Amino acid sequence: MLSQQEISDRFEIQDLLFHYADLIDRKQFGELRRSVFTDDAQIDYSAFGGVVGNLEETIAFLEQSLTDALFPNTQHFNGNIQIRLEGDSARGRVMCFNPMEMAVPDGATHVFFLGLWYVDDYRRTAEGWRISRRQEEKSWVFNTPDFMHFNA
């Protein structure tokens, strides 16, 4: 049976995951510093051609790549959240279904879908649970533009 602390920790981590998705979809990347990641976080978005680096490198990448002009709409739906608590740290695996609307040169938009997993480490801080390591793991893609080639 889960203790009250374990139940609370799981809910807090789930809220953190949903908060991350909301900030990404609203393009509030700077807020990731304050309320999602630890200062020393390491993030690996290479499964879909993104950056591998620290928090500042990741925020710079997001600000440059997920612009309103290029991606007017995105949605990151998290589910099948698996969390293994280990005191003040935890590990997790989170499914993400990610529809993306992309602007194309003729003025239209193109919608494609990404299926992925986030493989995470979490740490309890004075401000609450934060992600200390995140790695995207590709599961599948659908209807991506021909020029997009993602790592296997």
Go through the PLM ranges and name each one:
Residues M1-E31, S35:
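Short, low-complexity N-terminal intrinsically disordered segments enriched in polar/charged residues
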Residues F29-N98:
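A solvent-exposed, acidic/Ser-Thr-rich amphipathic alpha-helical stretch
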Residues D15, G53, W117:
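Short, well-structured alpha-helical interface segments that form or flank functional binding sites
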